[in-house]
Structures are given as structure tokens and as C-alpha cells.
Amino acid sequence: MAFPEKLKALRLENGLTQDELGEKLYLSRASISSYEIGRNEPTIETIIAISDLFKISIDELLK
């Protein structure tokens, strides 16, 4: 599963809206949306924050 699909799946599994995930990561809903559709890629800092939030390794997140 590619990163955009993985991010959306993790968000939905945890019962979060794009707005709620954005708040937890200090990002806008538009940023979350753009990651989920593959328009933009997050910074390494954001990848680390997502990994920490969902308690999964960066390797799991990106593979």
C-alpha cells in the first residue's frame, strides 16, 4: 500500500477526520487531503510526527 492510501487508512482506523488529524499534526485539512490523494509529499518532520501519532515505524508507514 502506498503512503497516501496508508495515511488515509490509518486516519479512518483511528476515527479521525482530516481536520482532526491536521490539528494533531499542526497542519491544515488541505495539507492532509493533498497527502492522501498523493498531490504533495510530507516533510520528514511530518512523517516522523505521523509515525509517532499512530505508533508505527517509519518503515511501516512508507512501505
Question: Predicted segments — roles?
Answer:
Residues 7, 21-22, 32-35, 61:
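Conserved hydrophobic/aromatic packing and binding residues within compact polymer-binding modules
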Residues 45-60:
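DNA major-groove recognition helix of helix-turn-helix/homeodomain DNA-binding modules
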Residues 26-41:
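Recognition helix of helix-turn-helix/homeodomain-like DNA-binding domains
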Residues 5-24, 49:
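Short basic helix-loop element that most often maps to the first helix and adjoining turn
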Residues 2, 60-63:
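Short hydrophobic/aromatic patches at helix-to-coil boundaries
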